[in-house]
Regions:
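Conserved phosphate-coordination/catalytic loops
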Residues: 122-126, 210, 251-253, 335, ...
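Leucine-rich solenoid repeat modules
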Residues: 13-16, 68, 134-137, 148-149, ...
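Residue-level marker of regulatory loop/turn positions in helix-turn-helix DNA-binding domains and
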Residues: 2, 6, 333, 404
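Core solenoid repeat modules with strong leucine/isoleucine-rich periodicity
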Residues: 206, 232-234, 270-271, 275-276, ...
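A structural signal for leucine-rich repeat
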Residues: 163-169, 190-197, 215-226, 241-267, ...
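Conserved hydrophobic position(s) of the canonical leucine-rich repeat
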Residues: 78, 143, 172, 199, ...
Length: 614
């Protein structure tokens, strides 16, 4: 019997089961319930399901399904706690402006009569009351991970100097904060960050005010010696523009030059991610922060980041990265360092993951290709997304950034070894993708291919719906014998002597133009890629924008190769592939591992934004 297996084996089995399966197994017997319940409730996520009502968490629902005694028994096993909300349309000023008044402690005031300050206090009070119900059920000193991903201010009772985390959960090792820096009240309540002195991994996005930077600096002063991963993101504003890396490591603004020996160092840091943070214009290697312990570096739209890469490429003690992500706009940086990324890539070897999102960058020619080629023997993942200013009309008076295909894509096989690269993402159209991938298809080891474009460019389209509609039409044509699903895009297979068949195909083709042309091109490429004449190693194909979770859900589509041993052709519109979703963790864990993280790399903008961006 399954429930007679040793506990060690059952724990090992649970590691390979999805959460729903673990819950189901725990109901089989009392022994399995005792073993699997701690696993089920080890990680808890509470959500605000509606971003227009961010003060309404599903805490009430949790206690509705668990009476207080059972909830306390379940939550005492919790080690990882997360509060989360979607961030799609509401990307700034998320607090009191997007809430449902729960009427707790209103003292007879109508919502319309409430001032902005009172409304904000009531909003945080609503959150505090719900969060405190969860806190009351946790075992003291039990949390190892705390995540506040609501994109709002944090109630003061959580992070203040004498708050809950500092008093009852001081052993947190992983801290993830997503706050609303655009809120005018987001300046207080974080003074207790410095009381958490065992944190190894910090991620904080949405910083804008100087008081927040002071809280972060106090935290870094207490944790810099053992911090292993640091991710910091500012939100653009008149305040944040005057803040820089110097403020974080303990230096004043000065002249932008790091030369003070009293700044903090990070001897254990292996992962660093900086977003929209002004970097020093000069960064001597023997002073301030050292990058030489890093194995992963991510720089997203940081002023002077090209200068930093240029300086690092000249250092005698070369940096040895496994992963590099760089997103930047050439119009906002120094023209003298246009080749900084190429020089940096040529300065070391051994890179495994490279993610680049470049806007308005001049043609780099062979130098850039050689920079990628320097890591040909080790490179496994490559993302390259390029955008350039393009005129909106024939007059050329107005321009905006548009996606473009890389000018070096014709040299793809020279730049990368397709026998090594398993994940590849390019801002390229399906037809061009086939042209550059087909010559090396037989020895290619490509498992995940992502044809990227920027979601905001296609907000007026529902690409996912268009592709599904086209698949349905082709399936209907197949069911009445007009054409086989895979032959729709193969003109030489059409029977032109059958009038009814020709008429139906012509109607499909006319309906696909112009608004379905992109969907048709993608399906044509997918038909080839998963066919015997395509890429044998390919397991999944993505199209569109997968950044920021589900923000661009209508501007993306994902398909995978059909497994003949498990799925009949009747389950698919096509014989060789089936659609699936990013949230299908079973599929990802089955054969693609970190595929979802790869698809979300190099976002075109921030998760949180600012009115200054518009």
């Amino acid at each position: 019997m399954f429930d007679t297996l040793p506990s060690e084996i059952l724990y090992h089995i649970a590691d390979f089961l999805p959460p729903n399966s673990v819950c189901a197994v725990g109901r089989v017997s009392r022994r399995l319930h005792a073993i699997f319940t701690p696993i089920v409730y080890q990680s808890i996520t509470l959500r605000a399901t509606n971003e227009w009502a961010l003060n309404v968490l599903d805490v009430d629902s949790f206690f509705l399904h668990h009476d207080y005694g059972r909830a306390q028994d379940c939550l005492r096993h919790t080690r990882h706690l997360c509060f989360q909300a979607p961030i799609q349309l509401v990307r700034f000023s998320r607090c009191a402006y997007y809430s449902i008044f729960r009427m707790t402690g209103m003292d007879g005031c109508s919502p319309d009569a409430m001032s902005e300050v009172v409304a904000h206090k009531q909003f945080l009070r609503d959150l505090e009351l719900q969060v405190s119900r969860i806190f009351s059920c946790l075992n003291p000193h039990s949390l190892r991970t705390f995540e506040w991903k609501l994109g709002t201010c944090v109630p003061t009772s959580i992070f203040e100097a004498d708050g809950y985390l500092a008093r009852y959960q001081p052993h947190i090792e992983h801290l993830n904060l997503l706050t609303d820096g655009t809120c005018f009240h987001a300046r207080h309540g974080l003074g207790g960050l410095s009381q958490l002195r065992t944190v190894k991994d910090l991620k904080w996005d949405g910083i804008q005010h100087r008081e927040e930077v002071e809280s972060l600096r106090g935290f870094l002063r207490c944790n810099h010696s053992h911090l292993e991963s640091l991710s910091v993101g500012f939100t653009p504003s008149a305040f944040a523009n005057s803040l820089s890396w110097n403020h974080l490591v303990g230096l004043g603004p000065g002249d932008g030059v790091c030369r003070t020996p009293t700044s903090m160092t990070f001897p254990s840091l292996t992962q660093l991610s900086l977003s929209q943070i002004t970097l020093p214009s000069h960064f001597p290697s023997d002073e301030c922060f050292t990058f030489h312990t890093l194995r992963s570096l991510s720089l997203r739209y940081c002023p002077n980041q090209l200068r930093l890469l240029h300086l690092l490429s000249k250092e005698p003690d070369k940096i040895q990265l496994d992963s590099l992500e760089s997103c930047f706009d050439f119009l906002q940086d120094d023209h003298r360092h246009a080749n900084a990324i190429s020089q940096f890539l040529l300065s070391f070897n051994g890179l495994r993951n490279l993610y680049l999102h470049m806007s308005n960058f001049p043609p780099l020619g062979s130098d850039f290709v050689e920079g990628i080629r320097a890591h040909r023997a080790t490179l496994k993942w490559l993302v390259y997304h390029e955008r350039q200013l393009a005129p909106l009309d024939d007059s050329g008076l107005f321009e905006e950034d548009r996606d473009v295909s890389p000018n070096w894509v014709g040299e793809l096989d020279h730049a990368i070894d397709q026998r090594q690269v398993t994940f590849l993402a390019l801002s390229i159209c399906p037809r061009a993708a086939r042209t550059c991938l087909e010559p090396a298809r037989e020895h290619s080891q490509l498992q995940l291919l992502h044809l990227r474009f920027s979601g905001p460019e296609r907000l007026h389209l529902n690409l996912a719906q268009e592709i599904r509609a086209l698949l349905l039409e082709i399936q209907r044509a197949s069911s009445v014998g007009v054409c086989a699903p895979g032959s729709y895009f193969q003109g030489d297979n059409l029977d032109t002597h059958d009038p009814s068949r020709s008429t139906h195909i012509a109607s499909l083709q006319s309906s696909a133009l112009p608004h379905l042309a992109e969907a048709k091109a993608f399906l044509s490429f997918a038909t080839w890629a998963f066919s015997p004449q395509g890429i044998p190693s390919l397991k999944a194909l993505a199209f569109g924008d997968f950044s920021h979770e589900d923000r661009y859900e209508a501007q993306r589509f994902l398909i995978r190769r059909r497994d003949p041993s498990k799925e009949s052709q009747a389950t698919s519109e096509y014989p060789d592939f089936v659609p699936f979703e990013v949230a299908d963790l079973d599929t990802w864990e089955g054969f693609l591992g970190d595929g979802a993280r790869f698809l979300a790399a190099c976002p075109g903008g921030g998760l949180m934004e600012s009115p200054y961006d518009f």
